[in-house]
UniProtKB/Swiss-Prot annotation:
A cellular-component GO term for this protein: plasma membrane
Family, as annotated: Belongs to the ATPase B chain family.
Protein name (Swiss-Prot/TrEMBL): ATP synthase subunit b 1
Source organism: Rhizobium etli (strain CIAT 652)
Coiled coil spans: none
Membrane-related topology note: Single-pass membrane protein
Main location (coarse class): membrane
TM ranges: 5-25
Record text on subunit structure and interactions: F-type ATPases have 2 components, F(1) - the catalytic core - and F(0) - the membrane proton channel. F(1) has five subunits: alpha(3), beta(3), gamma(1), delta(1), epsilon(1). F(0) has three main subunits: a(1), b(2) and c(10-14). The alpha and beta chains form an alternating ring which encloses part of the gamma chain. F(1) is attached to F(0) by a central stalk formed by the gamma and epsilon chains, while a peripheral stalk is formed by the delta and b chains.
Source domain of life: Bacteria
Key word S-adenosyl-L-methionine present: no
NCBIfam families (UniProt xref): PRK09173.1
UniProt-listed PANTHER family: ATP SYNTHASE SUBUNIT B (PTHR33445:SF1), ATP SYNTHASE SUBUNIT B', CHLOROPLASTIC (PTHR33445)
């Protein structure tokens, strides 16, 4: 068998030496370790991403819950304000009606008082007129003594009836 020292042989020897050097320097182990480290790093990044995603979902759920609570509280506040406005309106209406009723009653009372005063004035004027007429008639028809008695009786009767 004859060895040929041609280019193919030297390429083969170079390849074998390269592979031996690669194995001697533990390049496959380093590559495996590097790939394992990279895989661990990717796994950690995926776990971190998953944790961040879960945290984001938790925060989203919490903010949605807080938003719903705030909306419910706002609706409650609006309803309370509407109820209070209705109560204030009803109270103002009631007070206005009471004021009008009081004013009406006061006006009616003043009218009745004015009517009573007018009636009293008319009666007083009628009594004065009747007394004057009676005096005139009695003065023409009766003597002084009878006039004096009649006048005294009439005055006392008028006083008792008016008071």
């Amino acid at each position: 068998m004859e060895f040929h020292l041609d280019a193919t042989f030297f390429a083969f020897v170079g390849l074998v030496l390269f592979l031996a050097l690669v194995v001697y320097l533990k390049v496959p182990g380093m590559m495996a370790r590097s790939l394992d480290d990279r895989a661990d790093q990717i796994r950690n990044e995926l776990a971190e991403a998953k944790r961040l995603r879960e945290e984001a979902q938790h925060l989203l759920a919490e903010y949605q819950r807080k938003r719903k609570e705030a909306e419910a509280e706002a609706a409650h506040i609006v309803a309370a304000a509407e109820r209070e406005a209705e109560m204030l309106t009803a109270d103002a209406k009631k007070k206005t009606e009471e004021f009008v009723a009081n004013r009406t009653a006061l006006s009616e009372q003043k009218i009745l008082q004015a009517e009573a005063e007018a009636m009293k004035a008319v009666r007083s004027a009628a009594v004065d007129l009747a007394i004057a007429a009676a005096e005139t008639v009695l003065a023409k028809q009766a003597d002084a003594k009878v006039q004096s008695e009649l006048f005294g009786n009439a005055v006392s009767q008028v006083k008792t009836r008016l008071n």
